[in-house]
Amino acid sequence: MWCPEAKAQCESMKPGETVWVRLLQPVSSYSGKVGDKLQAMVIESPPCAGAESIAAGTVVLGEIKTVRRVGMGLVHETATLRVGFDHLLTADRREIEISARLVEIDNARESVKNGVIRGVNATDTPQGRITSRLKHLPTWNPYSDLTLIAFRAAFPVFPEPEIYLPRGTDLKLELATELRVPDEMRSTAQGSAPDEIDRATMEILAPSLPERTTTRNGQAADFVNVALVGTAEQMDHAFRSAGWEHGDRTSTHSVIREMHAFLALKSYPEAPISRQLMNGELAGATWEKSLDSYEKREHLRVWARNDVIEGQTVWLGAMSRETGATLSLRQHKFIHHVEADVDVGRGMLVRDLSLAGCVASVYYVERPQVERAAINATGDAMRTDGSLAVVQLKDCENPVFEPQRADAPAVATRPHSKLARYVRMQVLSFKSDVVRGNIVYGLFDLTRIAIRAQRNHAHRVEMAHQVETQRAPQVHVAAAATDAMMNR
């Protein structure tokens, strides 16, 4: 039941607040048309009085506002798409008007600027950028044309420039005006309350649980921030129902697939997840979720514990959200950079499992001894509230969302003919060489690289300094908290 104070507080959402929605149908710049109707569903909204402002599963109606496709590449190098969501649909089919704009697509290679989705440039790839720079070599190297031909022959990989967002794509909307939320659309607390004995047991266990994973050379890596309680079968079914995939083992085949995904700006949904240890043991399982980008994904490593709650296994997990990838010359491999706020990834994991109908209850155990800021094994700054999300699994039932089936009707995402795609790529490559294959653009390009490198370096130094500044008082607070908990 809503008390009067909570009802008054939660009856409206303010401009600037954000809502995550999930597409219920695919959208393509190649086949989409202005006016095509779209449907999505709310999956996350700001919390209010212990529940979300809008109930998960609430349908959002919208349409394609503008679309620009690449086609054969004669006019445009990149695709753009603007979608608008302007109504919420109540359970009794009433439409509530909203005003919101798109600000982010989760795990996407596409960018969003001023509410417009911007596709990738098929020639603005690692191999494409190197090719354009090789064009400057003829000014001092008469054999560079052979170099250029050899390079293009060695990397005949080009990304698809058209935009395609499949069913299940997560979009972040920002409210432009105040939204009055009807009573029937507001969420109530989801799931049943956790068993108090189970919670007390976990609170007793928490101080003895590992706080960080480590690399094989003993370097501190990710925060341990999730505990799953349930059988191995329940965990496997829960992640598959939520659309997550197992990570592949590292092999020659997986390395080739990673290279292809990196060069083609596409996803590798089962990409290997780097090995980390907990108490000297490798993860028993890894899970991940991505969309259309090799650089971005959410992933989880899990370890089975000897501890049991109500006869069920406790699985400890290290959850993080990756936002970029690069080839590390120091480590001689591809590495990913993580979202600084690791609690964001933890929340996304809990949300996805809950939407799949596989969660009996969720609660958070505070761990004051866990440092709030740290540097991971690849040099990225991380911050957290230190809490452990404890997810009690159950047999999946009544899902709010189900991933797209393999036999679902497909939409056209690119020219069907291989010949047409080959001609399009030649047109785009020629246009890129004409525009970028000159010394003026070369100087601009090198200047841009230098500025970006300097900004990235300055940002990493600043983040590292912030972490060290926060660590000093944490040491004393954590020690005092640990002593207090052990003396209870």
Regions found by a protein language model. Give the residues of each.
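Second-shell loop/turn segments in exported
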Residues: 50, 161, 220-228, 332-340
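A cross-kingdom signal targeting lumenal/periplasmic-facing segments of multi-pass membrane
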Residues: 254-456
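Contiguous beta-sheet cores, especially beta-hairpins with glycine/small-residue-rich turns
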Residues: 9-187, 257
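Compositionally biased P/S/T/G-rich terminal and signal peptide-adjacent segments
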Residues: 189-217
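Terminal, regulation- and interaction-focused segments at domain boundaries
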Residues: 208-238
